[in-house]
Structure formats: C-alpha cells, structure tokens
Regions:
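Conserved P-loop NTPase motor core
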Residues: 21, 29-684, 688-701, 756, ...
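Extended, charged helical/alpha-beta scaffold domains that provide interaction surfaces
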Residues: 354-362, 368-376, 610, 643-644, ...
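Hydrophobic, well-ordered secondary-structure elements that form the walls
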Residues: 482, 530, 869, 905, ...
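Short hydrophobic transmembrane-like helices used for membrane targeting/insertion
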Residues: 1, 6-8, 13, 18, ...
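Acidic, low-complexity intrinsically disordered tails
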Residues: 12-13, 21-30, 569, 573-617, ...
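Short, Lys/Glu-rich amphipathic helical modules
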Residues: 477-490, 763-764, 791, 818, ...
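Glycine-centered loop/turn positions within well-structured domains
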Residues: 251, 480, 537, 869, ...
C-alpha cells in the first residue's frame, strides 16, 4: 500500500527532528560553555576591560610626545633603561614606552598605531596571543611590546614563518628601533656564524622559527663556547603563531648526518607492495575484526591515515622475502620497510601530499599548500615514496640533534603570538604553552557576509555550482578567489573554467613562482583566482589591485630598457676582455647578460626596501617606484570603488579543511579593514571530510528529501554536522600532538641534563672533581657487578681483570692465595683501583701541566657525551617505534616509554662515565709542545650544517691502548670487550 503524502511528509520531519536532537546532544558541551561565557564574560572580554585604561593612558601621552624633538624622544630610551636599573618594572614603564614608540612609528614610518593596535601591543607584552583580523596591521602592533621588552637588554626574538618576512620586517620596523637607539639583527638561511652571533647579540632579532630552532641545536653541538651564537631565550613574539605552534608541532627539527644506504631494501619492499591488494575502510575500530572482514592484503584506514598488513599480507610477505615468521624480532627492519612501502602506496597521494619535480619528491604542506623544500618525511617514509615514484632513493640519515617546536618555544621566559585565527585552538594553546587568546576588536566594523554552506550530493554537482557562481561574479566585475585543498583539484577546476571561457590564474604548489603577484592582484575587477591553501595567509588582497605591484611591473620594464640599451657595446667589450683573459690564463669575465640580470633583480628587490643605503642606482629606483605608485593610485582607487559596488571580494571554498581555522583563514582574505565581501563553501557528500566523518546522516537526509545531484541544501543542521566532524578531527589531532609532546617531554628532560653537562664543559669550569667522582662510581659499579658473591671464592676476578685490562689492571693482577682471599673486601679492591687511577692522573698532570690536563678532561668528557647522546637519540627513536603495540597489551605506551627510556638513559650515563674515564687515563698527546684541541664528533650533512668548530690543523690526540668499545685488532669484528682471542687478551 502506498503511503499518503501526509505520512511521507511526517516521516521526513521526524527524521530531521531526530537528527537535530542528536546534534543538539553532541553540542551540549559547547552550549554550556557559550552560556557561561555570556553570563560571566570570556577571558578575552575581561582582559580587554583591564587593558582599556592602559590604552587610554598611552593615548593621553600623545600631545606630550609630539612636543619632543627627535633628540629628546631618542633620549627616552636611556632614561627608561636607567629607571629599570633603579627598580621600576616594565609594567611601570609601559604607558610612556608605548607612547614613545608610537610617536617614533609616526616620525619614521608615517604610521601611527590605532587604539586597537595599542591594545594588541599590550596583549603581546602580557604574554598572550593577540587574535587580529587580516589587514589590521599586526607588523606595526609588535613594535611597541618589542621596544618595551628590549629595554631589559636580554634580547627580543621576533619569529616569522619565512625569510622574506623576517628580512622585510627587520629592515622596515628596524628603522624605528634604530631611531630609538636599539640594535637590530637578522637570522635567515645563509647568514654566516659570526654574523649570527652579532644578530643574537642585538636588542631585537628577527628570524624564522626554523633558524631559531636549528641555531639552538647547533649551539649544543659546538665544542667551544665561542662558537655558540644564541645568548638565551628571554622573550619571543611569534607571528602566525597558530601555523608555527600548532601546524608545525608534530614536525621535529632534526640536524642529521649521513646514515646507511638502504635503497635496495626500499625498492624490494616497493616491488612487494605493488603485488598486494588494497582494502580501504573509513575507520579501523577493531583491528582483529576488521582484518577478518576485509578482502585484501593490507588495510588503509582513511580516518587515521594508516596502512596495516592483514594475515593474508603477512603470509605473502613471508613467502616473498623467504622468512619463516615476519613477527620475529630479527625481522623488525624488514617489517619497517614493508610498512613504509604500503603506506607510501596506500596513504600518500601524488599531487596531494607531495609532488615529483625534477626527479625529487617534494612535500606539499597540508596547511598552506606550499612546497616544503629541504623537508623529508621521517621514519623512512620519504625513501618509500621515492621507491614508489621511481626516483633516486636517498640514503637514510643519522639524527645528531633534535627538538620539537613545542619544547623549543616553551624554553622562553615569556612567549607571545599574533594571528588572525587562533580561537578554535584555544584549549591547545592554553594546555601546551600556557597562552591565553585575546580577540582584538577591528578598527572598522567587518562588512563581510559569510553565507551558508551549499551542500550537493556529488562532486560534479558541486563543481557545476562553483562554475556558475564564478561566472555570475565575473560578469558583474566582482573578483573571486576559489580555494581548493590540493593541486589535483585546483587543476580540475581550472579545466572547467577554461571550457566556460573564463580567464583566471591558478596558484598551487606546481605554479608558485608568481604567488605574491597573483594574490596581490586577486582583488582587481573581474579577477578570478584558483588557489590552494597557500593563498590563505601572508599577502593582503586589496580591492582594485595592489598599487605596489603595478608600479613594480612598470619599473621593471623601464629598468630593463635602461640596462640593456648599451648591451651591444658591452658584448663587444666582453669579447675583447674574454680574449685577453684566455691569453693571460686568468679567470674569464662574467657575460654582460648575467651582470644585467643580476643588477635588475637587485634593484627590483631594493626598490620598495627599507634598508639604509647610499647606492645611487638603488636610491633612483626607490624614487621612481614612489613616482609610479602616485601615477597608478587614481586608477586603483577608481577600480576599487567599482569592486566595492560589485560586492567586494567573493571567497569560494570548494571543500572543508580538517581544521576550522584553515577555513577561517580563507574567509579572512575578504573584508579587510571594513571592505565589503562575501564567502561561501560549496561542498559535496563525496568530499573526504563529509565521506569519512558523518556524511551518512546528511546523505540519508538528502535521500529522504529526494534531491538531485545539482540541487543544493542549505541548512543549519548540515553546517552543524560539518562543524561537529571538524571538532572531532581537531580533538583527534590535538591528542596526537599532545602525545608527540608527551614522548618528547621524556627526551626533553634527558636533553636538558645532557646539554647542561655540555654547557658546564664549554663554560670552562674545573671538572676534575667531577671526573674523579665518575671514576670512583665506575669502579664501584664494576666491583659490584663482578664481586657479587657471598665470599671471595665466588668473585669473578677474571671478569674484573678483563674489564679494567690495560688501563687499571695488568694480567698479573688479582691472583691471590687462599689466605689473601680471606682478608679481601670489595671496598679494599675498589680503593686500590681508585688509587691507581689517581696515580695515573697525577703523573699525567706532572707530565703535561695543569692547563693541558684541564683541556684533556674537557675533551674526554665532551667527546663521550656527544657520541653517546647521538646513539641514544637513535635508540630512543627505535624504542618509540615499538611502543604502539603496547596499547594492545593494556599498557600505557607513554608510561612504558618513560620507564624504559630513563632506564636506557641511566645506562648511557654509566657508559659516558666509564668511557670518559677510560679515555682520560689512556690518552696521550703526540706533540709535547702542542696544546690539545677539541674536535666535533659528528658533522651535519646537507643544508643547515653548522659551521665546523675548532681550529684547522689542530694537534690530534690519540688513545694509546685499545678501548673497550674499539674493534679488536685480531680482526674478528667484535668489540674488544666481547672478543675472546688469546693474542690481545692474555689474561684468558
């Protein structure tokens, strides 16, 4: 019997009602939080109320500051420093210091911070995150807290996400600090060690997060204190703080050296992975049950992004590699290669997670869409992808030093940050970094309209709607920015727009060279720009276009014409000079084309720069640039008015990101400084986020309503479902980052102990007593180990003799009569060995002198600390790799890692103790008149390698006796302590 229309309608309403109740239950926690914030006010609201009176004090001082001459204003810096020395605090100085800096901003830059920017500056001084919308002038905001905190003389670090911004801001804002009598330094890629040291010694240091972190690691690898560049971590302001402290939190900084070449095994593992059948599931809830259900050799869990062999896959692996049991400990390395191969083929996708360019696999940043040159996936995944793509498989690397951004930035006494999107990650900022977020009001009311999501059943339906929306906006002259999540999808949309005959620019990881130009001109009338997330931040999109880029384009043509007008004459001169150089056998001159190109690029870089210069060509280029800006200004204003009339910039999102924050960044490109604009997300049930996280509920709703693929649904229920999925994923990613931190906290505690011990050596402290204690402890440990029987008859004298052979023992030692055994004690034997050691050291001091002995002591301890620590890093990494399976045994992997990790650390400390003492007792100097020099144990390879420490041609040191961990000279391949040959072990 056919149901009546009323019954059908009632059924649909019930389904919607039930779904709404379900969603309401999920959002109860958010509702309660929102209720209490409305009732009592959020932290941000309360903080703004506390800050407003301070802001008013700063503004009230403006007339007083305006009356001061430049010299009087500059003298305030000296006055403030003197007041700090007399006991005043930075908080006491804040109103005056901010007012002084604000006036300096105006006199030097022609910009005066607005009241809301003063609020932002106070928030930064209070070690919070200032959440400021796009176009609100974060760069200028930072000048006030930077100036105030630099007065302490401890140094302020301003951290940016790339070299360009660090250089630009150090030159631009640096003018203000220099005007006020402060020094400014810059730390970017390529800066030499001596210049880095000077940069860190400055009052204000600009640099990237990577450079600050790597310099910290390099400082803890140097062998002389003079080679260290950083001087402490007092105060840092992190620009785009969410990008650095959240998005980059799972990526450790690693300085590595050359490791083993395992390319053959990676290729074999990939050959095996090609033969396997893949099975994809949304979520692997029950591993065992899932493996029984799936029809494949390995399972790809889309939600967790993992790949796991099934029982069928294990059997095939054992047959392919001719092993009996893949789970055996002996096959752990093989399992590592196989796991990497199936993850490379099942989880990692070309043109989404990475691209292949000129025979190299380059990572695509999932948050920005930019190429991450120099970065590599860890745990051998990068090599597995290289094998999959058929490019050269690079050798594995050995980790020499490592730290996460989480633990690096938690070292600062005071930390603050700026971003346009932080609120969605408030819990993480608070829990991990102790940072609260204050939302700064905009200077002008926001006029952007955020339209409801349009959800379609299929991707085709969604793309058709996107093209229609773009065509509609384009027809009326409204600029459009279309955001995509991958290279692949941006190119698919580009093809559809070409078919429609709509001119557009594409900006993705493959076509990033014109990024700044494309994004800056994305606000021109009728412009259409398709971009991955790389357009989400960092460059302002100005309505009507960017006058600076128009002026630069015109200036490039003029300069190119001027520089090449005498090219023919220059070529003739070059040919004559080249002939003379060949005849004389001297170096050939540079071709004029190369010289002209280099000069052109230099002038184009400097034409809008801020660095002080006396170069006439640069000064002329800057003057002409300003003139061209004035010429283009009226045209830009007319076009901007037309764009505003058309509705401003229209933002189209074609897919929701895993994080709401990234979506908000895309929306934030429109509506800067009160400009009109709009945003809308076009989604489909086939999108990854919808398909994996809760799309079934929406699918059922759309099916029940009988909607076709090109008919959208715009409903709050849909939006709530999507946001709920994003919140779940954000919580999941937070949990992962938190676990990364928990693991790294174990390493961090150990790292602090090791680095503190290194620093003690570098500082030149007298470590003689420390080494004497280490010798006593090593002797006591050995005696406890070998002399552990109840009576002397049960003691292992042969073992003790082997242990100390050739440094504290001779083959004739510990041969006792029965009567002598009765009088022996462990303490007596230990005392005798310790006395021998002290006698050896006393003789060495007499032979070499106290100065040389102190240096030898430092060499021995430093070499052993460094070499053992590097091995320990690898061992801890291997331990962590095996921790995942502990969860199946009802054990907390982090707790197990901490317990076993510190047991390994204790073993390493004992090894450092014994080997350092052994080296000190046996070391000899070849050249009596030469002072011993320290040498770096391991040297990094590739980019970011630290400058080699020490002195070239230093007098070498040598160990005259065989070390316990040295290879036995008999050629067995065993360490001396484990070899049983008679020739080199006469006591056996």
């Amino acid at each position: 019997m056919t149901a009546s229309p009323v019954r059908v309608y009632y059924s649909k309403v019930c389904k919607c009602y039930i779904a709404a109740l379900s969603r309401a239950a999920e959002n109860t926690g958010d509702f309660i939080m929102s209720f209490f914030e409305k009732l009592f006010g959020s932290f941000s609201d309360k903080e703004l109320k506390r800050i407003n009176p301070l802001k008013d004090k700063v503004l009230a001082l403006e007339p007083e500051m305006q009356k001061l001459t430049d010299e009087q204003l500059q003298a305030k810096t000296t006055e403030f420093k003197a007041r700090l020395e007399k006991g005043e605090t930075l908080d006491d100085l804040l109103p005056e210091a901010f007012a002084v800096c604000r006036e300096a901003d105006w006199r030097v830059l022609g910009m005066k911070p607005y009241p809301v920017q003063i609020i932002g500056g106070i928030v930064l001084h209070r070690a919070c995150i200032a959440e400021m919308q796009t176009g609100e002038g974060k760069t200028l905001v930072a000048t006030m807290p930077v100036y105030l905190n630099a007065l302490t003389g401890k140094g302020v670090h301003v951290v940016t996400v790339n070299d360009y911004l660090a250089r630009r801001d150090s030159e631009w804002m640096g003018k203000v600090y220099r005007f006020l009598g402060l020094t400014v330094g810059l730390v970017v890629h390529g800066v030499e060690a001596n210049d880095r040291k000077a940069a860190y010694a400055a009052d204000v240091t600009y640099g990237t997060n990577n450079e600050f972190g790597f310099d910290y690691l390099r400082d803890n690898m140097v062998v002389y204190k003079a080679n260290m560049v950083q001087r402490g971590h007092a105060y840092a302001i992190v620009d785009e703080v969410d990008s650095i402290l959240i998005d980059e939190a799972r990526t450790p900084l690693i300085i590595s050296g050359k490791g083993e070449d395992s390319s053959v095994m990676y290729k074999r593992a990939d050959d095996f992975a090609k033969t396997l059948k893949k099975s994809v599931i949304v979520e692997l809830d029950d591993k065992v049950a899932a493996e029984e259900q799936v029809d494949g050799d390995y399972v790809v869990d889309e939600k967790r992004k993992t790949a796991t062999l099934t029982e069928s896959g294990v059997q095939k692996a054992e047959a392919f590699f001719h092993v009996e049991n893949l789970a055996d400990a002996d096959n752990m390395s093989l399992r590592h290669y196989i796991d990497g191969a199936i993850k490379a083929r099942g989880v990692m996708h070309r043109d989404i997670d990475y691209i292949v360019k000129e025979g190299e696999v380059i990572i695509v940043d999932e948050f920005t869409g930019r190429l991450m040159y120099g970065r590599r996936f860890n745990d051998g995944l990068h090599q597995a992808i290289e094998a999959k793509e058929g490019v050269t498989v690079a050798a594995e690397s050995k980790t020499l030093a490592t730290v996460t951004f989480q633990n690096y930035f938690r070292m600062y006494d005071k930390l603050a940050g700026m971003t346009g999107t932080a609120s969605t990650e408030a819990d993480e900022f608070s829990e991990i970094y102790g940072l609260n977020i204050v939302s700064i009001p905009t200077n002008k009311p926001r006029a952007r309209k955020d339209l409801p999501d349009s959800v379609y059943k299929t991707v085709n339906g969604k793309y058709n709607a996107v093209i229609e929306q773009v065509a509609e906006c384009h027809a009326k002259g409204q600029p459009v920015l279309v955001g995509t999540v991958s290279v692949e999808k941006s190119e698919a949309l580009s093809k559809l727009l070409k078919k429609k005959g709509i001119e557009h620019n594409v900006l993705n990881a493959k076509q990033h060279e014109r990024e700044a130009e494309i994004v800056a001109q994305a606000g021109k009338q009728g412009a259409v720009t398709i971009a991955t997330n790389m357009a989400g931040r960092g460059t302002d999109i100005m309505l009507g276009g960017n006058v600076s880029y128009m002026a630069k384009a015109a200036l490039r043509k003029e300069l190119s014409r001027d520089l090449t007008k005498d090219l023919a004459q220059l070529k003739d001169e070059y040919e004559h000079a080249k002939a003379r150089a060949k005849a004389a056998g001297t170096e050939l001159p540079t071709p004029p084309e190369e010289t002209i190109d280099a000069q052109l690029e230099h002038l184009m870089t400097e034409c809008d720069g801020h660095a002080e210069t006396e170069d006439a060509a640069v000064l002329h280029a800057r003057q002409r640039f300003e003139e061209l800006c004035e010429e283009f200004e009226p045209e830009i204003k007319r076009e901007a008015a037309a764009v505003r009339e058309a509705g401003g910039l229209f933002i189209i999102g074609t897919e929701r990101h895993e994080s709401r924050r990234i979506d908000n960044q895309l929306r934030g490109r429109a509506g800067r400084q009160g400009d009109p604009g709009a945003s809308r997300f076009f989604l489909s049930l086939e999108d990854d986020l919808m398909r994996i996280f809760g799309g079934e509920r929406v699918q059922n709703l759309m099916d029940s309503l009988g909607l076709e693929e090109d008919v959208p649904i715009e409903n709050k229920l849909i939006t709530n479902t999507i946001e709920s999925a994003q919140k779940k994923l954000e919580a999941s990613n937070f949990a992962i980052r938190k676990q990364v931190l928990q693991y790294d906290d174990v390493m961090n505690q150990q790292r602090e102990i090791i680095y503190k011990q290194r620093q003690m050596v570098l500082d030149g402290e007298d470590i003689s007593d420390k080494l004497h204690e280490m010798m006593r402890q090593s002797i006591d440990d050995a005696c406890t180990n070998y002399l552990n029987g109840e009576t002397a008859d049960d003691w292992d004298f042969a073992g003790l003799r082997r242990h100390f052979m050739n440094w504290l023992c001779l083959p004739s030692d510990f041969n006792y009569t029965k009567d002598q055994l009765e009088d022996l004690t462990k303490e007596g034997i230990a005392d005798e060995l310790y006395k021998r050691g002290m006698d050896i050291l006393t003789a060495k001091e007499k032979k070499y002198g106290s100065k040389t002995m102190r240096e030898l002591e430092r060499i021995c301890l430093l070499r052993n600390v460094d070499s053992k620590w590097m091995d320990h890093i690898d061992n801890m990494d291997q331990l962590k790799q095996g921790m995942g399976l502990r969860g199946y045994g009802q054990h907390d992997p982090v707790v197990e890692y901490r317990i076993e990790g510190f047991a390994m650390f204790d073993e390493m400390i004992a090894s450092i103790r014994e080997d350092a003492v052994h080296m000190l007792l046996t070391i000899e100097i070849r050249q009596q008149n030469a002072e011993p020099k320290r040498e770096q144990i391991a040297k990094p390879t590739g980019e970011g390698a630290p400058t080699q420490a020490g002195t070239k041609g230093a007098a070498p040191v040598r160990v005259t006796k065989i070390g316990r961990n040295d290879p036995c000279p008999c050629g067995s391949g065993l360490k001396w302590k484990k070899c049983t040959c008679k020739e080199y072990h006469p006591d056996l």
